[in-house]
């Protein structure tokens, strides 16, 4: 299976949301990384066939998804940032309702609802109302509904926003587990969501694709540019004024700074191996990282 994004652009009035995006996807997890407003959601909505591009096209095995229409949508599982749910429905009833909308027979729906509830570890909560679920449970029901039609292409937009670390890890592991024979597109501004599971990472900024590579290859441009340094309290503000300081950790009466700099920021600075948090700051240091 091959999914191709061919020179896709999208504008809203005079504002350009995406500019000339070209990509190719096969099975595996692809992380789409960018700050808020970078064009991630617009890109995901176009690939999910929820929104039409202003120019360019998306192809599945060489065929335009606009021409495939419902045949393409049958292959899609989509989890948007906000999933509309009926709060008085139980988890089981909600999933059965969505299964009916997706055209599953009653027998098929019952079997599939049981399967996805088990997959997202919510079988014991099947009779509980979704309106009383925690944020993590709500996101898991969201991914469950996206999987009801056994999609070949799974598109999830900012799935872990607002979740605690335990739920984020659970969700990340679930996506990794189901990606063996699917294309999984995961958009996020939380680096740790994709660092361990992404086959490739796409970096979007201002609606443009600025990098696309494996996590290891993405880090090469900042090798030798990440430093750690112990300073006293007055040194913290001094180095923050001059350099990109990614992290500050207190160690007894001193502070350890993690600095991104083309040159050695201080004779005592020690070179460190870069990670994707460093990469994010390298590209989005002017953005607010949530």
What label would you give each PLM region?
Residues 35-39:
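Walker A (P-loop) phosphate-binding loop of ABC-type ATPase nucleotide-binding domains
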Residues 56-67, 71-72:
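Conserved ABC transporter NBD signature motif
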């Amino acid at each position: 299976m091959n999914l191709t994004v061919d020179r896709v652009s999208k504008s809203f009035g005079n504002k350009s949301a995406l500019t000339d995006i070209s990509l190719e996807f096969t099975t595996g997890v692809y992380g789409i990384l960018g700050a808020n407003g970078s064009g991630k959601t617009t890109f995901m909505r176009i690939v999910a066939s929820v929104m039409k591009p202003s120019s360019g096209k998306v192809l599945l095995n060489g065929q335009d998804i606009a021409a495939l229409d419902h045949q393409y949508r049958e292959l899609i599982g989509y989890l948007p940032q906000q999933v509309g749910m009926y709060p008085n429905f139980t988890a089981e009833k909600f999933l059965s309702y969505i299964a009916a909308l997706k055209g599953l027979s009653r027998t098929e729906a019952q079997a599939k609802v049981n399967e996805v509830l088990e997959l997202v570890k919510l079988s014991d909560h099947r009779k509980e109302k979704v309106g009383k679920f925690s944020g993590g449970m709500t996101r898991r029901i969201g991914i469950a509904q996206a999987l009801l039609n056994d999609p070949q292409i799974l598109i999830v937009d900012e799935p872990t926003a607002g979740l605690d670390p335990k739920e984020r890890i659970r969700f990340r592991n679930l996506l990794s587990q189901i990606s063996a024979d699917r294309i999984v597109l995961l958009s996020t501004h939380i680096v740790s969501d994709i660092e361990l599971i992404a086959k490739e990472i796409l970096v979007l900024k201002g609606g443009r694709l600025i990098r696309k590579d494996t996590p290891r290859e993405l880090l090469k441009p900042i090798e030798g540019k990440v430093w750690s340094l112990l300073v006293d309290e007055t040194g913290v503000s001094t180095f923050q004024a001059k350099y990109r300081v990614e992290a500050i950790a207190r160690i007894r009466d001193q502070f350890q700074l993690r600095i991104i700099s083309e040159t050695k920021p201080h004779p005592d600075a020690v070179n460190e191996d870069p990670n994707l948090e460093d990469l994010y700051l390298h590209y989005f240091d002017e953005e607010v990282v949530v």
